[in-house]
């Protein structure tokens, strides 16, 4: 599974000891594999001398989080004081998706401006149909809209990512919200929730279905699909143009 690092991340050797001479840099496109028997995630990342593999105890640092952007305005008619924190999950979902697909670290301000210019900023959120259309033009991507879990699963296993349109059924949000399906680690779907905050998944229902590892979520694909029921489309399947 590929994912963008959004912060400097400390790493360990395969035995779990800290490796003070190595680190993952913000902007690195990384390949993360399922946990080892030692409970560590292998991460392969670029260096000046080629790729290197080290290990991390959790998936912290791999998320563009809208909660960090309370000072970045994202106005819409009727929501003139809105910010990326209050209404920009779609913006940060797009940053997470583009980073994982292309290795391009897109500044949130740049993605915010893109959403506004293309008319994707609407009262209450982001028009993802319009924004993904612009992402395809700007970053050389392709997008297929889908309502089928089987198509989502096949797409992720072939190396794509998906922006997922949750319906506020209480698992990932109590209101409409965008999250990103990054791929699978073992049999679990790895999800980037741009609205993640401390304690969000600590309720009994969420805790039973979703495991938080650092800044990313691990869950069953069916759990995500159930939370998207009622949305059309449920999934924006994004991939690079061959």
Identify the residue ranges that each predicted region occupies.
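Catalytic cysteine-centered active-site loop
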Residues: 104-152
